[in-house]
């Protein structure tokens, strides 16, 4: 099977989900902290309500900044709390790609990712790993992560990752992808596994009652806004760098 979907964050701004035509959506739930915990994407609650109202199957991803396995486990617990009132049809992905990890060892990066994935699984969620091909090849020990479903970004004409593990979702472009109801570019993905059927078989139905506010104990809005601005700048820089690398590879 093959279905087409998108992934979005606050970078896309306000989305008119009634106009979006897609098979699935992966929402950014937020990003983790160096020492543990997480910040919620400022558009997550609205996006979650929007996709549910539109009847679009969805999952989430958490952008990683954790600097230790202990921090990753705390982030997983916070994310599990956030998702308690939702019924997901796609996995919870750990997005490990930030440049800070290129300065850390492969062993440390792998231990951090594994800690998050194991913790999410212990919390009862279907956990998966998101990264891009060269990061997986250079900064992770993929043999230790092969038990988890992979979502790989590779903007070449075909999936280039051939390492350990199964790639069930391919992010094949980050620019030029347009979807009605969303302003600007949006990441485009292909999925090769029937996650909704798996989720229906594994999880009893729960009443959908999205929370109306942010849980107590989260970071002040001013700090959230500053971190959001920093993240958006990093995301733009990463996308530009990745596109230039892919262009060089294609021209070689």
Predicted ranges, named:
Residues 1-19, 23, 141-216:
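Functionally critical loop-and-helix segments that line ligand-binding/catalytic clefts
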Residues 62, 131, 154:
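Short beta-strand/turn micro-motifs composed of small residues
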């Amino acid at each position: 099977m093959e279905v087409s979907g998108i992934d979005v964050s606050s970078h896309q701004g306000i989305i008119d989900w009634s106009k979006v035509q897609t098979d699935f959506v992966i929402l950014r739930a937020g990003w983790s902290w160096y020492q543990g915990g997480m910040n919620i994407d400022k558009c997550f609650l609205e996006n979650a309500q929007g996709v549910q109202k539109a009847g679009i199957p969805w999952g989430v991803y958490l952008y990683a900044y954790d600097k230790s396995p202990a921090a990753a486990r705390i982030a997983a617990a916070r994310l599990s709390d956030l998702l308690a009132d939702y019924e997901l049809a796609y996995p919870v992905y750990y997005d490990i790609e930030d440049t800070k990890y290129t300065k850390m060892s492969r062993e440390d990066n792998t231990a951090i990712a594994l800690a998050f994935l194991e913790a999410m699984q212990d919390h009862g969620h279907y956990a998966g790993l998101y990264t891009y091909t060269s990061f997986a090849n250079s900064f992770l020990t993929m043999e230790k992560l092969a038990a988890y479903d992979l979502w790989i970004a590779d903007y070449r004409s075909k999936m280039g990752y051939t390492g350990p593990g199964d790639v069930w979702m391919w992010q094949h472009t980050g620019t030029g992808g347009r979807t009605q109801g969303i302003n600007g570019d949006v990441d485009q993905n292909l999925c090769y596994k029937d996650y909704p059927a798996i989720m229906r078989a594994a999880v009893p139905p729960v009443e959908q009652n999205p929370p109306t506010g942010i849980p107590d104990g989260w970071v002040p809005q001013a700090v959230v806004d500053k971190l959001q601005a920093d993240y958006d700048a990093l995301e733009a820089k990463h996308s530009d760098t990745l596109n230039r690398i892919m262009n060089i590879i294609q021209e070689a």
